[in-house]
């Protein structure tokens, strides 16, 4: 009987040592732990190739705005309503006009067009053009759009092919 209690006591001591470690892991999120280098945070600003470097804080703010305003349909960089068109770098670059820079993404969020750029889809896709139709866009300003664009462009550098890769990564 004494050996059972001795064994139980050793097990409990082991758990007591492990609990602070587990709490520390639970409290520290990857976003808090991430300190990305300038190369990771640097993305194309416009079609001419000019670059802009975002701060960690700006990317975190962009992530929050994106998740609140766009995350329902674009979680993880996918497009739930059209799995052929995601937010991965290749798809953004092949759009017409290309949407692989901050300026183009902001322009798209203001007045979205079809993937081939032939017609407006503002009546179907949330945008600033009709914030009454899409209330999630109502309170966003140009700075919010810029931060979301930064987040969209930095995400594949951090998450790799999982960003825009679809359900196989979830």
Curated annotation (Swiss-Prot):
Q: What does this protein do?
A: One of the extrinsic, lumenal subunits of photosystem II (PSII). PSII is a light-driven water plastoquinone oxidoreductase, using light energy to abstract electrons from H(2)O, generating a proton gradient subsequently used for ATP formation. The extrinsic proteins stabilize the structure of photosystem II oxygen-evolving complex (OEC), the ion environment of oxygen evolution and protect the OEC against heat-induced inactivation. Low-potential cytochrome c that plays a role in the OEC of PSII.
Task: Answer whether the UniProt record assigns the keyword Ribonucleoprotein to this protein.
Answer: no
Q: What is this protein called?
A: Photosystem II extrinsic protein V
Q: Which residues hold heme c?
A: 70, 73-74, 125
- What top-level branch of life does the organism fall under? Bacteria
Q: Which gene encodes it?
A: psbV
What family does the database annotate?
Answer: Belongs to the cytochrome c family. PsbV subfamily.
Task: Cite the InterPro entries for this sequence.
Answer: Cyt_c-like_dom, Cyt_c-like_dom_sf, Cytochrom_C550, PsbV_cyt_c550, PsbV_cyt_c550-like
Q: How does it sit in the membrane?
A: Peripheral membrane protein
What Pfam families does its record include?
Answer: Cytochrom_C550
Q: How does it assemble?
A: PSII is composed of 1 copy each of membrane proteins PsbA, PsbB, PsbC, PsbD, PsbE, PsbF, PsbH, PsbI, PsbJ, PsbK, PsbL, PsbM, PsbT, PsbX, PsbY, PsbZ, Psb30/Ycf12, peripheral proteins PsbO, CyanoQ (PsbQ), PsbU, PsbV and a large number of cofactors. It forms dimeric complexes.
Q: What compartments host this protein?
A: Cellular thylakoid membrane
> Per the annotation, which location comes first and is thus the protein's main one?
membrane
An example of a GO molecular function for this protein is: heme binding
Question: Where would you find the membrane-spanning parts of this chain?
Answer: none
Q: How is the cofactor bound?
A: Binds 1 heme c group covalently per subunit.
User: GO CC terms for this protein?
Assistant: photosystem II; plasma membrane-derived thylakoid membrane
Task: Name the species this protein comes from.
Answer: Synechococcus sp. (strain CC9605)
Cofactor dependency = heme c
N-terminal signal peptide:
1-33
